[in-house]
C-alpha cells in the first residue's frame, strides 16, 4: 500500500517534455499531416508537462488529478483500436513447402 505522500507522476517530467518536443518537431508534423490531413495537437503534452512540474514543485492535488486523468485517456485510446489482422494460433500446415513458380508469360 502506498503512503499518501509518495505518489509519483505516471511518467517522469522529462518524458512529457520529450513527447511535447517530438510532437512539435518538423518530421512529426509532416508525418501527422500526411496521415491525418491536419497538424497534431500538442497542447495535451504541454498541459501534462506543466502539471508534472507543478506536482514536483508544490504537490498540487489538481495537478495530480489532471495527470491521472490524462494517462487514463491515453490508455483507453490505445485500447479502443481493434487488431487489423487475425492472429494465428499456429503456422499454416504447408508453411515449409516451396512457393509456386511464376507462370511463363
From Swiss-Prot:
Location relative to the cell: Synapse; Synaptic cleft
Instruction: Report the superkingdom from the record.
Output: Eukaryota
Q: In which tissues is it expressed?
A: In the postnatal brain, expressed diffusely throughout the hippocampus at a low level at 8 weeks (at protein level). At 16 weeks, strongly expressed in the stratum lucidum of the hippocampus (at protein level). In developing and aging brain, expression is strongest in hippocampus, especially in areas CA3 and CA2, throughout the dorsoventral axis.
Q: Name one GO cellular component term.
A: synaptic cleft
GO BP annotations of the record are:
negative regulation of long-term synaptic potentiation; regulation of synaptic plasticity
Provide this UniProt record's keywords sorted from A to Z. Secreted, Synapse
Where does the sequence pass through the membrane?
none
PTM notes: Rapidly degraded by proteolysis following neuronal stimulation, resulting in increased AMPA receptor clustering.
Q: Quaternary structure?
A: Interacts with RTN4 isoform A/Nogo-A; the interaction results in enhanced RTN4-mediated inhibition of AMPA receptor clustering. Also interacts with NCAM1, RANBP2 and CCT8.
Q: To which protein family does this belong?
A: Belongs to the UPF0545 family.
Question: What role does this protein play?
Answer: Negatively regulates long-term potentiation and modulates adult synaptic plasticity. Stabilizes the interaction of RTN4 isoform A/Nogo-A with its receptors, inhibiting clustering of postsynaptic AMPA receptors at synaptic sites. Upon neuronal stimulation, degraded at synapses, reducing RTN4 signaling and allowing AMPA receptor clustering at individual synapses.
- This one is known as Synaptic plasticity regulator PANTS
Tell me what organism the protein belongs to.
Mus musculus
Classification of source organism: Eukaryota, Metazoa, Chordata, Craniata, Vertebrata
